[in-house]
Amino acid sequence: MKKGVLIAFEGIDGSGKSSQATLLKDWIELKRDVYLTEWNSSDWIHDIIKEAKKKDLLTPLTFSLIHATDFSDRYERYILPMLKSGFIVISDRYIYTAYARDSVRGVDIDWVKKLYSFAIKPDITFYIRVSPDIALERIKKSKRKIKPQEAGADIFPGLSPEEGFLKYQGLITEVYDKLVKDENFIVIDGTKTPKEIQIQIRKFVGELIDNSF
C-alpha cells in the first residue's frame, strides 16, 4: 500500500495559502488519492463556533478549546483514516494556526502544544509568508469586507477593521516566524505570482510523493 502523506499550509489571512492548497489538490488528484481539509470545518461544530463568535461568547480559553474540538473531530474521522488508507491529505491550516491564534490571545503556547499533542506532525508544512500590509491590500482589491475574526475584533474591539487586521495579523506573523525553525516550515515568498508559488510547492511535493511508495 502507498504511504499516506500529510501536507499542511499555514499563513496569515490574505496570504493566498488556501488558493495554493486547492491548486495542489487539483494537481495531485491526477495521480494519487487526495483529501483536502480546512480549519474550522467539522460537520457538527462549525455552526456552533460561528454562532459563538457572532455573539461574542468565546473567552480566550473557550476559543482555544472549541477549535481544538473541531480539529480533533476532523482528525479522528477524516485525517487519520485517510492517511492510513494511503491518501495524500492536504490541510489548509493545521495545529500551528492554533499555536498562533491562541497564544496571541494570552493562552500559554506550551499548554496549547500539549492540547494538540495527539496530532501527528505533517510530512511537510508550507508557510506562505506575506506582510500584513500586502495581505490587507489583497483583501481590499478583492472588494470584500474584513471579517471580524481576521481583525482580532475580540481582542482589539476599539480598532477599526483595517487597524485591527494589521495589528492582529502582525502578531500572528511573529508567532509563525518563531515556529519556522522548530517546526521545519518551508517558507514560501507569498509575494510571488500564484503560478511561481505553485511551481515551487510542486517541486517539494513531487519528491515527497515519489518517496512515499
Swiss-Prot record:
InterPro entries the record matches: P-loop_NTPase, Thymidylate_kin-like_dom, Thymidylate_kinase
Residue sites binding ATP per the record: G11, I12, D13, G14, S15, G16, K17, S18
Its EC number(s): 2.7.4.9
UniProt keyword terms in alphabetical order: ATP-binding, Kinase, Nucleotide biosynthesis, Nucleotide-binding, Transferase
Domain of life: Archaea
Annotated GO MF terms: ATP binding; dTMP kinase activity
One GO BP: dTDP biosynthetic process
Catalyzed reactions: dTMP + ATP = dTDP + ADP
Gene Ontology CC annotations of this record: cytoplasm
Keyword check for Transferase: yes
HAMAP family: Thymidylate_kinase
Record-stated family: Belongs to the thymidylate kinase family.
Protein name: Probable thymidylate kinase
Designated gene of the protein: tmk
